[in-house]
């Protein structure tokens, strides 16, 4: 069965919509949800990632949730292999694979069946030594000189992606982006729906979302994960909210530090949303729906529009 994909910025209600769609199809078509959020892969990282609690999943099978320990490194290539296998297995059972998430590379690696550039451990080790010597900012400046286009989309503090880009540029002799496939027909002919809303409204939702995360126990969740190795995790330690809380804990965890962590989490999430919008909006295959209004009638209209687009594609 042809998959349905729901993408869009953080805070637009993608996960809730997926469950509502599965409910709407209940008794007609079985639906299984496949996560495409990098940090929801991690066990124990629930509150800060916006993971739908088990009790609220309404018995709908979910895949690619809670599959990694916080000390394990999440990779796009590893996710692509596992999620593609899930999607094909779901379809083979006659069920609808519903891919949901906002991690840009994870979504595109699946929909465009990326082939990943080769790796060279010796070259990577050399760049990692360089990183240890000069730090993330100066290494990123090196990427600016070698591949300005890659540097423009890789955040200054994302040392892991900076190292990978420099490795690929050295191996291939071409810009990092040249290794990415062109956007064509989506894999499995998936219907792709994008959710977004007015910036002012989304900013308000992100502020409320951040407050709710802290009120529900994000700080306690981070503290509980520290003995599990959260601070050592290459990927998990960079998650929005978790990184900011760990900094506050290092600073003494007083009221001022924790308030700052909440403010910085909200600001970082807004910056991330801008990157998500920039990335997803360039994909002309996406049918965008406005999730600004949250009334029951408008929600019903969105569900009908999503199902209509999927049925037409099928």
Curated annotation (Swiss-Prot):
Its EC number is 2.5.1.75. Its cofactor is Mg(2+). Substrate binds at residues 10-15. Transmembrane segments: none annotated. NCBIfam families: miaA. It comes from Mycobacterium marinum (strain ATCC BAA-535 / M). Catalyzes the transfer of a dimethylallyl group onto the adenine at position 37 in tRNAs that read codons beginning with uridine, leading to the formation of N6-(dimethylallyl)adenosine (i(6)A). Keywords: ATP-binding, Magnesium, Nucleotide-binding, Transferase, tRNA processing. This is tRNA dimethylallyltransferase 1. It catalyses: adenosine(37) in tRNA + dimethylallyl diphosphate = N(6)-dimethylallyladenosine(37) in tRNA + diphosphate. Pfam families: IPPT. One of its GO terms (biological process) is tRNA modification. ATP binds at residues 8-15. It comes from the Bacteria. Belongs to the IPP transferase family. The keyword ATP-binding applies. One of its GO terms (molecular function) is tRNA dimethylallyltransferase activity.
């Amino acid at each position: 069965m042809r998959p349905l994909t729901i993408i869009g910025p953080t805070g637009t209600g993608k996960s809730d919509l997926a469950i509502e769609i599965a409910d709407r199809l209940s008794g007609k078509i079985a639906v299984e949800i496949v996560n495409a959020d990098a940090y929801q892969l991690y066990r124990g990282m629930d509150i800060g990632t916006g993971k739908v609690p088990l009790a609220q999943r309404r018995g709908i099978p979910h895949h690619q949730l809670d599959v990694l320990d916080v000390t394990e490194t999440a990779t796009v290539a590893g996710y692509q292999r596992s999620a593609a296998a899930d999607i094909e297995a779901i379809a083979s059972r006659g069920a609808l694979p519903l891919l949901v998430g906002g991690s840009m590379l994870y979504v595109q690696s699946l929909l465009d069946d990326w082939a990943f550039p080769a790796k060279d451990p010796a070259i990577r080790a050399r760049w990692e030594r360089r990183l240890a010597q000069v730090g993330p900012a100066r290494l990123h400046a090196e990427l600016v000189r070698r591949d300005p286009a890659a540097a423009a989309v890789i955040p200054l503090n994302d040392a892991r992606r900076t190292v990978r880009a420099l490795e690929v540029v050295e191996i291939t002799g071409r810009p990092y982006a040249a290794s990415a496939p062109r956007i064509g027909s989506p894999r499995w002919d998936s219907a792709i729906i994008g959710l977004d809303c007015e910036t002012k409204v989304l900013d308000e939702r992100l502020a409320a979302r951040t407050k709710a995360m802290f009120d529900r126990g994000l700080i306690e969740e981070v503290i509980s994960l520290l003995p599990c190795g959260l601070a050592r995790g290459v990927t998990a330690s960079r998650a929005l909210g978790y990184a900011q809380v760990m900094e506050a804990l290092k600073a003494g965890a007083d009221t001022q530090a924790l308030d700052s962590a909440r403010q910085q989490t909200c600001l970082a999430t807004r910056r991330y949303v801008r990157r998500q919008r920039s990335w997803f909006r360039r994909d002309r295959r996406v049918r965008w729906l406005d999730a600004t209004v949250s009334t029951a009638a408008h929600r019903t209209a969105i569900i009908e529009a999503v199902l209509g687009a999927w049925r037409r594609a099928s």
